[in-house]
Amino acid sequence: MKILFISLGCDKNLVDTEVMLGLLASRGYEMTDDEQEADIIVINTCCFIHDAKEESIQNILEMAELKKEGKVKALIVTGCLAERYRDEILEEIPEVDEVLGTTAYDKILDAVDAALEGDQEVILSDIDALPLPETKRLVTTGGHFAYLKIAEGCDKHCTYCIIPKVRGNYRSVPMERLVNEARELAEQGVKELILVAQETTLYGKDLYGEKSLHKLVRALCNINGIRWIRILYCYPEEITDELIQVMKEEPKVCHYLDLPIQHANDTILKRMGRRTTKQELVDIVEKLRSEIPDICLRTTLITGFPGETAEQHEELMQFVDEMEFDRLGVFTYSPEEDTPAAGMPEQIEEEVKEDRQAEIMELQQEIAFDKAEDMIGREVLVMIEGKVADENAYVGRTYRDAPNVDGLIFINTDEELLSGDFARVKVTGALDYDLIGELL
């Protein structure tokens, strides 16, 4: 039988999808990308912000139509939306057969069996259980890079965020298990490991009594075949001197950090439940750039948080201008039910949020272009992603670019290159967020 898997949301969700795909493949199920030939459809959902929730619901409704028409034998919904609205999904969309919570992915085979037998049920596990069964993942990212989810859940409880309710408390995956998983990925041809979690920098504190991300990274550096290790979702206040030292000493560790700071006004930061002040953020950024001069820093911001004044928005704009982050994304605030921020007074109109978002991104575009122009003439190591269709050109990424969120470099060459190859490239031109180069 053929299964179509629709994976929505973040890279952490994608890891969950790959785990379930591995379990299904071990049973002999065949995967397909064509909904018209699928016997079973599984939708791994997201509900982090309003748009993600809407996308998940729309996908469920579209696939439910196929089930209603008799084209699909079973429809299963998993992920954050399933955990949060499990009963409502079954009540309001009767075409859905099974709903799996975020810690019940090891029961995907049971869910498929039950769905094919005509059962309709919710399958849950303890919200604070370690959700990922030890199984061989079916990597879906092309084979040359893969995400390594090092922890689940979050203890921060930011006032705008629903994640602790749908993912549980923070719990680290044991280091030995992660090293074994990374070794298996390397044996499959993976060359870049991208460490992800709701927060990576707190890794190990629950298991080992101290933050141990630096120890994990050193252990991963010893795996043959791994060329790059990239770290995402670092909380600024949790970055340790030991982690900085590992980044300086280990050549496999990309000089790249993703630091979601969300805002720069102290009042807004406090209302968000964040644990840093503006000055502390400045100090952390300056320290990282002093210790690792070629580091690439990515951040994300939220604009239009309840009570954000025009003056506080201008302060954020000034902060972005002064800090000159290499990479930056901006979300408009999305009120999520059952979060403290959703009930706060002075909610901002959507039009104002979007205008402020556009202003920040216009400023960041100028910063990004200036930084891209500064790269012209430099020689860089590039991981090849693939060939540009119908052209003698390839596209790749430098250490400064995480897949799917950052820029690319376009390389003109007649040589034959493969995805996952590394090549030395001279930068010859700059676009808004991307580079142009020639093979050396």
Where does each model-flagged region fall?
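Proteins enriched for Cys/Gly/acidic motifs involved in redox and nucleic-acid/cofactor modification
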Residues: 1-203, 242, 253, 257, ...
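Terminal RNA-binding accessory module
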Residues: 343-440
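Conserved SAM/AdoMet-binding glycine-rich loop
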Residues: 75-77, 84, 187-311, 321
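Short glycine-enriched, charge-decorated loop/helix-capping segments at active-site entrances
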Residues: 47-48, 167-168, 207-210, 270-276, ...
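Active-site proximal loops enriched in glycine and acidic residues that flank catalytic Cys/His/Asp
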Residues: 197, 233, 261-263, 299-303, ...
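Short strand-connecting beta-turns/loops that link adjacent beta-strands
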Residues: 36-37, 155, 252, 264, ...
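Conserved, mostly hydrophobic/aromatic
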Residues: 178, 195, 231, 259, ...
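Conserved beta-strand core positions
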Residues: 3, 40-41, 146, 193, ...
